[in-house]
Design a protein with these regions (language model features):
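Short, glycine/charged-enriched secondary-structure capping and boundary segments
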Residues: 22, 84-87, 116-119, 220-224, ...
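Conserved Switch II/interswitch segment of TRAFAC-class P-loop GTPases
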Residues: 43-48, 75-85, 96-159, 172-186, ...
Length: 367
């Protein structure tokens, strides 16, 4: 399954610089003026996972295949975007196609870099973007309510219940509250509405506090304020320096680690973002290990073996028989499949087995 992260923010907060660094690309214009991103830029990035390297040391495959994550650099939003201001609705629709919103927020002072609102204020910036997302959701939900009203009058099955919840959700949005904070968001009707409408304010949000080189090791006042706000709203804050992320491009893993350590940082911005996105979306990885390739596969936590097998090929799910499973720890400890098998650590699991993060799996199937 694919994971897509939309990078949003006001103009000139470091979005495109961050995108370029995270994707090790230079295809997103990065300049000191609003709307330098005219079209949304997309790039696929490997999900870093050191476990793949350890598996490869044992198996010695022809290639290593990481899971992939898509980053989408979305043009800077401004007040009125939901009504077509700035670059408008087209870019709100680009956000709609993503699973996670990475909201880059400027948390540094620099006179030479203009701010579209005239000064640095992270919480104001966050509220501007949030308001535009909510307003766009209100417009879309209102159209759905018109349709549901007609269906309810025609006594279509489930229409009255859906209409009742949709009106309740609209009231919630009209109070300036995100769909993600709606009290009944676990209900089946809510989930169906969100799946159909892909409401923007229902998406998982990660705030990227973009600091300068001096603010990377300790939180400045801007970051502290953003973290306090995020905590109240059940969101995560990742502190990153777009300039430092750019400097990491082209460095080996060892060089990157040394460079980050010298700055008092344990993890790159990319690693933080992916780790947090995985956690927010309830994603895990399992592995397949053979002489042709060692590969990581991304699935939802709680998936049973046949469903997990479907990300390789639908036939694996349709014709599922059994799954041979070795935990990552046992695979490493016993030096591979043969050693794990001799130690009694290879298990045969059936259709009800819930796959765990790090499982090394081989599927038996017949179509």
């Amino acid at each position: 399954m694919s994971l897509s992260v939309g990078i949003v923010g006001l103009p000139n907060v470091g979005k495109s610089t961050t995108f370029n660094a995270l994707t090790k690309a230079q295809n997103a214009q990065s300049a000191n003026y609003p709307f330098c991103t005219i079209e949304s830029n997309k790039a696929m990035v490997e999900v870093p996972d050191l476990r793949l390297n350890e598996l490869a040391k044992i198996v010695k495959p022809e290639r290593i295949m990481h899971s992939l994550i898509e980053f989408v650099d979305i043009a800077g939003l401004v007040k009125g975007a939901s009504k077509g201001e700035g670059l408008g609705n087209k870019f709100l629709s680009n956000i709609r196609e993503t699973e996670v919103i990475l909201h880059i927020v400027r948390c540094f002072d620099e006179e030479n870099i203009t701010h579209v609102e005239g000064g640095v204020d992270p919480l104001r910036d966050v509220e501007i973007i949030n308001t535009e997302l909510i307003l766009a959701d209100i417009e879309q939900l209102s159209k759905k309510i018109e349709k549901l009203t007609k269906e309810a009058k025609a006594n279509q099955k489930g229409a009255k219940e859906s209409l009742e919840l949709a009106n309740s959700l609209l009231d919630h949005l009209n109070k300036g509250l995100a769909a993600s904070s709606y009290p009944e968001k676990e209900s089946e009707i809510y989930q169906a509405l969100i799946k159909e409408l892909r409401l923007l304010s229902a998406k998982e949000v990660i705030y990227g506090a973009n600091v300068d080189e001096n603010g990377i090791s300790e939180d400045n006042d801007y970051v502290k304020a953003l973290k306090e706000y995020a905590k109240k709203n059940d969101h995560e804050v990742i502190k990153l320096c777009a300039k430092i992320e750019e400097e990491l491009v082209g460095l080996s893993d060892e060089e990157s680690h040394e460079f980050l350590s010298s700055l008092g940082v344990n993890e790159s911005g990319l690693d933080q973002i992916i780790r947090t996105a995985f956690a927010k979306l309830g994603l895990i990885s399992y592995f397949t290990a053979g002489v042709v390739e060692v590969r990581s596969w991304t699935i939802k936590k709680g998936w049973k073996a046949p469903k997990a097998a479907s990300v390789i090929h639908n036939d694996f799910e349709k014709g599922f028989i059994k799954a041979e499973v070795i935990s990552y720890e046992d695979y490493i400890q016993y030096k591979g499949e043969n050693g794990a098998k001799e130690a009694g650590k290879l298990r045969l699991e059936g259709k009800d087995y819930i796959v765990l993060d790090g499982d090394v799996m081989h599927f038996r199937f017949n179509v």
